[in-house]
């Protein structure tokens, strides 16, 4: 049926019409078509153990579950008050970072570039930097411009020298301009997060690139919190703030982007909403300790903080009872504050909920993919629930195998392999040769769900095809309850699907589960 003013079809229905189906069929004739039988034969081969062996033998990334460094750097930068991320690279690169963040958080994502093109990539982009910083400062009036790299790393542009030259030419006058080298062709968004955060702290603590004296640490009782690259940053950071407030702990959240990615619609446009105050960023050097919620997001930042005399503690995405216990014990030990009764009661509620639902989760097999801290945290929680994390895959988790070996050492399921440096094409082989009950990961897993029939539970980044997941915490006891409910809902949905045929399977299509 064609479009008409009386009956407007959206794309979900429009392209099913006969005229569009015929157009798509005709289009295939000009695309070097293959015999459908041969296509199905090859598909069948890719589902076999023999193909899996060849797949894992190849040093090839077909469908990596990671993004590039500058995305993580932009994510960090917007977590500071009045900060505009400035990527020394092309406009297309920045369009990718902005769209990626906007599609996940459903919020505008401010970021600019030096608009490098082919000539600047060959001969250097100094002039692009000078003009770009001047335009950014004059048009958007940021308190801080955080400069990172992308395409410029191919030729090796020196950001520090370029920024100094730009300041000498008057491009930037009053704004602080920290920087970090974040080449897009090595590492991942997690590496970029780490490099950018270290660069910002280094700027404020070590004398603003030689334009101010280095700060001298005067220890106080505050604690710094680093959230890491996190698709649930809005809900998680708010949950951590709530816990710290209940315990009466003075704190600073470094790179606090919980407001900029959840700005209210109230008639006032805010390009920069919330964020860690510039003064608090500098004063964070005086804190008693710094806690990283994600170890592998801060592999360079935490040693830098430690060099300045602070205690440093790291966790791996604290989901569930044991992980939250460890977090609260660490907070209590460092601060000297008691764990309040309210948190003890929340713990009891989570334990009660797990006990209520254990019969439905116990023994279920799960495959997990995503960032290394996320994979570790979810695997630990699944073991806590009595489930089996059969496959744990992290494209950007070089150390996840060793850490998971320690985690699984006491598992009733024995040694469960982890797959660092592997991608979603490897996961496809795993799901066909060693099937599981459920898959946990980001939006890109929906193609694995369609291909292998493994139901997908969406946790991680990015999640494009569902809305507002980022507003709810997955850390802490309350976050553990949210994850538990998400898992149970998918389990019950699958039970309903398999028991809904009248007269055949509906004997178990129950109201009560």
Swiss-Prot record:
User: Does the keyword section mention Amino-acid biosynthesis?
Assistant: no
The Gene Ontology biological process annotation of the record reads:
nitrogen fixation
SUPFAM superfamilies named among the record's database cross-references: Helical backbone' metal receptor
Q: Which CDD domains does the record associate with it?
A: Nitrogenase_MoFe_beta
PROSITE patterns noted in UniProt: NITROGENASE_1_1, NITROGENASE_1_2
Q: How is the cofactor bound?
A: Binds 1 [8Fe-7S] cluster per heterodimer.
Positions binding [8Fe-7S] cluster in this chain are 68, 93, 150
Q: Which GO terms describe its cellular component?
A: molybdenum-iron nitrogenase complex
The molecule here is called: Nitrogenase molybdenum-iron protein beta chain
Q: What is the native source organism of this protein? A: Bradyrhizobium sp. (strain ANU 289)
């Amino acid at each position: 049926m064609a479009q008409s003013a009386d009956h407007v079809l959206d794309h979900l229905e429009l392209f099913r019409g006969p005229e569009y189906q015929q157009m798509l069929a005709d289009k295939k004739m000009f695309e070097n078509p293959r015999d459908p039988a041969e296509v199905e034969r090859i598909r069948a081969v890719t589902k076999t153990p023999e193909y899996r062996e060849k797949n894992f033998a190849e040093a090839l990334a077909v469908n990596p579950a990671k993004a590039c460094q500058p995305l993580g750097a932009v994510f960090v930068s917007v977590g500071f008050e009045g900060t505009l991320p400035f990527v020394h690279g092309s406009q297309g690169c920045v369009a990718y970072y902005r769209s990626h963040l906007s599609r996940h958080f459903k919020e505008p994502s401010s970021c600019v570039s030096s608009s490098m093109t082919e000539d600047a990539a060959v001969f250097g982009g100094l002039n692009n930097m000078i003009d770009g910083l001047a335009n950014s400062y004059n048009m958007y009036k940021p308190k801080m411009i955080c400069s990172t790299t992308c395409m410029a790393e191919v030729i090796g542009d020196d950001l520090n020298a370029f920024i100094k030259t730009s300041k000498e030419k008057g491009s930037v006058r009053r704004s602080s301009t920290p920087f970090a080298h974040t080449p897009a062709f090595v590492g991942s968004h997690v590496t970029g997060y780490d490099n950018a955060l270290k660069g910002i702290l280094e700027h404020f603590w070590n004398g603003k690139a030689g334009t101010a004296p280095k700060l001298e640490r005067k220890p106080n009782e505050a604690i710094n919190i680093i959230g890491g690259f996190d698709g649930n940053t809005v809900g998680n950071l708010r949950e951590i703030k709530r816990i710290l407030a209940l315990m009466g702990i003075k704190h600073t959240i470094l790179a606090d982007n919980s407001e900029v990615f959840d700005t209210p619609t109230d008639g006032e446009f805010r390009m920069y909403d919330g964020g860690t105050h510039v003064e608090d960023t500098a004063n964070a050097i005086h804190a008693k300790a710094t806690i990283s919620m994600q170890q592998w997001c801060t592999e360079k930042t935490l040693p830098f903080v430690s060099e300045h005399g602070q205690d440093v503690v790291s966790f791996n995405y604290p989901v569930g009872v044991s992980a939250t216990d460890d977090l609260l014990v660490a907070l209590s030990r460092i601060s000297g504050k008691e764990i309040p009764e309210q948190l003890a009661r929340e713990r009891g509620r989570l334990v009660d909920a797990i006990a209520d639902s254990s019969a439905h989760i116990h023994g279920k097999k799960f495959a997990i993919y995503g960032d290394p801290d996320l994979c570790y945290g979810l695997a630990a929680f699944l073991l806590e629930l009595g489930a089996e994390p059969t496959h744990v895959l992290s494209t950007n988790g070089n150390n996840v195998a060793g850490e998971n070996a320690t985690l699984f050492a006491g598992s009733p399921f024995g040694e469960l392999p982890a797959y660092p440096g592997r991608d979603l094409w490897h996961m496809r082989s795993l799901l066909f040769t060693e099937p599981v009950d459920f898959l946990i990961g980001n939006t890109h897993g929906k193609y694995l769900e369609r291909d292998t029939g493994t139901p997908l539970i969406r946790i991680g980044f990015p999640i494009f095809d569902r809305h507002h997941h980022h507003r709810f915490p997955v850390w802490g006891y309350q976050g553990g309850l949210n994850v538990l409910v998400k898992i149970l809902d998918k389990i019950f949905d699958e039970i309903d699907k398999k028991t809904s045929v009248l007269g055949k399977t509906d004997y178990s299509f129950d109201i009560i589960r």
